[in-house]
């Protein structure tokens, strides 16, 4: 079975946790313990978020004023290497030594006319109090938005159109390699058709939407969107909340989910299920084996109408 696992940012750094290398490695180790359970006998691709990490690099760059800050596409590439290295090493420590791994720097095409460039929505970096956020917005010209009871910097998040490195990813999978790619939604890139040239863009692509595109282009058998809850819920946080066990994309789309949290995950699952006729599942990383067996998570499928709740 060809599996694409999209790791949420919380799998790499928990909310409010200091962004140290040791903390990130420990979280990667915990995630690797779960993902390694589904590696034997399957073709495995791992995508991951990078919001906290790319924000931290931006802050570190801004602190050294003798060099102009690096653009977001370059910072995204840096995080792909850093996080991919940690995942490779921690997964490799759990699986037989001869199992090959590869991290692919992944350029992802976006449209320069995407309206997202005029409406920044993607949170990056650490969380701030209202006072801190307002001060930083004034000092640095950032766009700031609420994130729960805190605030974060937000940047443009255009839709992914095409993954340029999809052929090398396929070649590696066919040779039995576990591939880490499309980290942080990939490196946002524009393609000049006339000049046949690529150029980076100041943006961060949504990891879940890019993972959905990746799974579609790889013709994956299942897309697993791993998060810190066991399913997608209706009425989340209310006494009436209910976990969704299974849903047809059309029915799920009518419910509406928060744009900054579950919304992109649900949309990514819907797009994959519609495009391929295969299942996408939103659930907890701790349940990954049960998810592959159809026993856990919210399964988005075109094969059955309606919605079922737990």
Swiss-Prot record:
pH effect summary: Optimum pH is 7.0.
UniProt-listed InterPro entries: AceGlu_kinase-like_sf, Asp/Glu/Uridylate_kinase, Carb_kinase
Origin: domain of life: Bacteria
Pfam families linked to this entry: AA_kinase
Chief localization: cytoplasm
Pathway(s) it belongs to: Amino-acid degradation; L-arginine degradation via ADI pathway
GO molecular function, one term: ATP binding
Keywords, alphabetical: Arginine metabolism, ATP-binding, Cytoplasm, Kinase, Nucleotide-binding, Transferase
Induction: Induced to high levels by anaerobiosis, induced to moderate levels by arginine and repressed by ammonia.
Oligomeric form and interacting partners: Homodimer.
Family: Belongs to the carbamate kinase family.
PANTHER family: CARBAMATE KINASE, CARBAMATE KINASE-RELATED
Reported function: Kinase that plays an important role in arginine catabolism. Catalyzes the phosphorylation of ADP by carbamoyl phosphate. Shows weak activity with acetylphosphate.
Protein name: Carbamate kinase
């Amino acid at each position: 079975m060809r599996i694409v696992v999209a790791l949420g940012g919380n799998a790499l750094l928990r909310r409010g946790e200091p962004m140290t290398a040791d903390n990130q490695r420990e979280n990667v180790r915990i995630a690797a313990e779960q993902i390694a359970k589904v590696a034997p006998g399957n073709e495995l691709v791992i995508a991951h978020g990078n919001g906290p990490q790319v924000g931290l690099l931006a802050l570190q760059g801004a602190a050294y004023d003798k060099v102009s800050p690096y653009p977001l596409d370059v910072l995204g590439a840096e995080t792909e290497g850093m996080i991919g290295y940690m995942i490779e090493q921690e997964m490799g420590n759990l699986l037989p030594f001869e199992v090959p791994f590869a991290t692919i720097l992944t350029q992802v095409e976006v449209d320069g006319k995407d309206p997202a460039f005029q409406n920044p929505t993607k949170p990056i970096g650490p969380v701030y109090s209202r006072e801190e956020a307002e001060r930083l917005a004034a000092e640095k010209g950032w766009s700031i938005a609420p994130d729960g009871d805190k605030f974060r910097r937000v940047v443009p998040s255009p839709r992914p159109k095409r993954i340029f490195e999809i052929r090398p990813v396929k070649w590696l999978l066919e040779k039995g390699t576990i591939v880490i790619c499309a980290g942080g939604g990939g490196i946002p890139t524009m393609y000049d058709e006339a000049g046949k040239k690529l150029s980076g863009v100041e943006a961060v692509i949504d990891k879940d939407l890019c993972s959905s595109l990746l799974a579609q282009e790889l013709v994956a058998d299942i897309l697993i969107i791993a998060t810190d809850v066991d399913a997608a819920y209706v009425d989340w946080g209310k006494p009436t909340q209910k976990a969704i066990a299974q849903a047809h994309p059309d029915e799920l789309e009518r419910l509406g989910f928060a744009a900054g949290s579950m919304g992109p995950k649900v949309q990514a699952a819907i797009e994959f299920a519609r495009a391929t006729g295969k299942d996408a599942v939103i659930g907890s990383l701790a349940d990954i084996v049960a998810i592959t067996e159809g026993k856990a998570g919210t399964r988005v499928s075109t094969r059955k109408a309606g919605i079922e709740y737990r």
